[in-house]
Curated annotation (Swiss-Prot):
Residues recorded as bearing Phosphoserine in the entry: 511
The protein, known as: Homeodomain-interacting protein kinase 4
Entry keyword Isomerase: no
Described purpose of this protein according to its UniProt entry: Protein kinase that phosphorylates TP53, and thus induces TP53 repression of BIRC5 promoter. May act as a corepressor of transcription factors (Potential).
GO molecular function: ATP binding; protein serine kinase activity; protein serine/threonine kinase activity; protein tyrosine kinase activity
Alphabetized SUPFAM superfamilies for the sequence: Protein kinase-like (PK-like)
Keyword set, alphabetical order: ATP-binding, Cytoplasm, Kinase, Nucleotide-binding, Phosphoprotein, Serine/threonine-protein kinase, Transferase
Catalysed conversion reaction: L-seryl-[protein] + ATP = O-phospho-L-seryl-[protein] + ADP + H(+); L-threonyl-[protein] + ATP = O-phospho-L-threonyl-[protein] + ADP + H(+)
Compartment(s): Cytoplasm
GO cellular component, one term: cytoplasm
Composition bias, Polar residues: 496-511
InterPro entries according to UniProt: Kinase-like_dom_sf (IPR011009), Prot_kinase_dom (IPR000719), Protein_kinase_ATP_BS (IPR017441), Ser/Thr_kinase_AS (IPR008271), Ser_Thr_dual-spec_kinase (IPR050494)
Length: 616
């Protein structure tokens, strides 16, 4: 067992958690405290020296943050010797990608997605206060702290790609954001700001629900094509201003066309670049609204007599999709900010409370909401309060005092659920097409194992009238996308340079949108009331770049395109005085009508008829 030491402490290296191109992450024992830590180890050379200096600068900027309240990883110390650099962080359990992999990439319930989203938004809000862009938000960089003791409590990690707005030119990263989570302004070469992280978080939310990346592009053309096919083309003025528009779009040959631009066809792209576009999506959505129809999301709306619990869960999912739509806009100026997202009804549970407060689903969601914000040794500190000023988490406590808590706690709905081991998706809904990826990201097979996802729903509707006969929905079953073995995501052949740093919008500490007075009449009007966010994160990055933060990964994502840092200008763009309109994708068509079923009289109908005939 190797040993290394700083000026003040000594560390025993227990095991190597992961290795990367430029270093490794090891699990170590800190002798002074007896705690296990994560040690990020990089070789001592000129290139890595610049990387370390950038990360240390950001960690220094965040030294005043409380890592627990800000949901960022706790940094302990840095030291070096003649051969290596060492950064010591707290040891966390696993990242969201590893968690998904353990559970066969089964869809995560909306209430758990809210718990994760809330914490990441708090982190982004605090980073914005410090004028920091994370620039590499993805499942691998969101870590579960301790899933047994604190379910779905997370922290943001890996600040190797992060940058301070005013000093972003000194960041030596060869790319901005991992491709699957890359914002349109980065893809198109438009001015960008901290809202690139909001786009990434929206993609992560969709992926947690789908069990598969929303836009898993093999290259930037595929990435833009996927977004266009789901959300429609960007507005013409966006493409007029975009430096890289000609890479993906061409002028419309029809002068009378509504949009003077059109997306290049796959054949055009192949002829120009000799690179064949690939289809790697599992769910080919024609609008973001269709997200709620995947993985049984619309079951409650199609039941003859929907259960209250099913209705509550479906309403929650619908609210989540509305937030995702606000996060995934072509135009960054139309995109919701972290502080406004914290007040969105999905995150604050405002709509759920108003319409479904008496359901077990609401109580369970409330409990998860409260626990995610609770810091050990401190009372829970709510981010969002009810309209009357009462913190939402107290609603559950008041009900427990009134005797309702005992009923809720004894209910099977309050048992901590594990994600099912198999995905279940409903086919032939609207225009949604389910398709096995022609080129698997992780490998994928079909099985005959039936998902147990609907077990809680079936239990909830026990005793209610169900149709006696009728066709069942056509189901598509997907097993682990690892195909029973851990297969690495292989990077595509041939990367192209991609310089994006010249697009930066230099921001002040507070955006103009946050200076408006809060009238409190709606969640959007109070968007400047951001929640506290906090410090950075550590150890983890897949094969997307030189930093080795995500080394615990067995499966790696493809390498995004690189850019030449020397091409970055030294001058900064002034804040633009133009305002662009957002683009909303086409809305999904209504669900096809179900076939009518012969139903018996509802419960209680016989006694009612007897009552009527008895009076006549």
């Amino acid at each position: 067992m190797a040993t290394t030491q700083s000026e003040t402490d000594c560390y025993d290296i227990i095991e190597v958690l992961g290795k990367g191109t430029f270093g490794e992450v090891a699990k170590g024992w800190r002798r002074s405290t007896g705690e296990m830590v994560a040690i990020k180890i990089l070789k001592n050379d000129a290139y890595r020296n610049r990387i370390i200096k950038n990360e240390l600068k950001l960690l220094h900027c965040m030294r005043g943050l409380d890592p627990e309240e800000a949901h960022v990883i706790r940094f302990l110390e840095f030291f070096h010797d003649a051969l290596k650099f060492y950064l010591v962080f707290e040891l966390l359990e696993q990242n969201l990608f590893e968690f998904q992999k353990e559970n066969n990439f089964a869809p995560l319930p909306a209430r758990h997605i809210r718990t994760v989203t809330l914490q990441v938004l708090r982190a982004l809000a605090r980073l914005k206060e410090l004028a920091i862009i994370h620039a590499d938000l993805k499942p691998e960089n969101i870590m579960l702290v301790d899933q047994t003791r604190c379910p779905f409590r997370v922290k943001v990690i890996d600040f190797g790609s992060a940058s301070i707005f005013s000093e972003v030119r000194y960041v030596k990263e060869p790319y901005i954001q991992s491709r699957f989570y890359r914002a349109p302004e980065i893809l198109l070469g438009l001015p960008f700001c901290e809202k690139v992280d909001v786009w990434s978080l929206g993609c992560v939310m969709a992926e947690l629900h789908l069990g598969w990346p929303l836009y898993p592009g093999n290259n930037e053309y595929d990435q833009v094509r996927y977004i266009c096919e789901t959300q429609g083309l960007p507005k013409p003025h966006l493409l007029h201003a975009a430096r890289k528009a000609h890479h993906f779009f061409k002028r419309n040959p029809h002068p009378d066309a509504a949009n003077p631009w059109q997306l290049k066809s796959s054949a055009d792209y192949l002829a120009e670049t000799k690179v064949r576009p690939l289809e790697r999506r599992k769910y080919m959505l024609k609008s973001l609204d269709q997200i709620e129809t995947v993985n049984g999301g619309s079951v409650a709306s199609r039941l003859t007599f929907p259960d209250r619990e099913a209705l509550a869960e479906h309403a929650d999912l619908k609210s989540m999709v509305e937030l995702i739509k606000r996060m995934l806009t072509w135009e960054s100026h139309e995109r919701i900010s972290p502080s406004a997202a914290l007040r969105h009804p999905f995150v604050s549970m405002q709509q759920l409370r108003n319409a479904h407060e008496t359901t077990h689903y609401y109580q369970l969601s409330l409990r998860s909401y409260r626990l995610s914000l609770q810091v050990e040794g401190k009372p829970p500190a709510p981010v969002v309060a009810a309209e009357d000023g009462t913190p939402y988490y107290r609603l559950a406590e008041e009900k427990e005092a009134a005797g309702m808590g005992s009923v809720a706690s004894s209910s099977p709905f309050f048992r901590e659920e594990k994600a099912p081991g198999m995905q279940r998706a409903i086919d032939q809904l609207d225009d949604l097409s389910l398709q096995e990826a022609g080129h698997g990201l992780w490998g994928e097979t079909c099985t005959d194992v039936v998902s147990d996802m609907m077990a809680p729903l079936k239990a909830a509707i026990t005793g209610r009238h169900m149709p006696d006969s009728g066709p069942e929905p056509i189901l598509a079953f997907y097993s682990s996308r690892l195909a029973g073995r851990h297969k690495a995501r292989k990077p595509p052949a041939g990367s192209k340079s991609d310089s994006n740093l010249s697009n930066l919008i230099r921001l002040s500490q507070v955006s103009p949108e946050d200076d408006r007075p809060c009238r409190g009449s709606s969640w959007e009007e109070g968007e400047h009331l951001g929640a506290s966010a906090e410090p950075p994160a550590i150890l983890q990055r897949d094969g997307d770049g030189p930093n080795i933060d995500n080394m615990t990964m067995e499966a790696e994502r493809p390498d995004p395109e690189l850019f030449d840092p020397s091409s970055c200008p030294g001058e900064w763009l002034s804040e633009p005085d133009w305002t662009l309109e957002g683009v909303r994708g086409p809305r999904a068509q209504g669900l096809p009508p179900r076939r009518s079923h012969q139903h018996g009289p509802p419960r209680g109908a016989t006694s009612f008829l007897q009552h009527v005939t008895g009076h006549h």
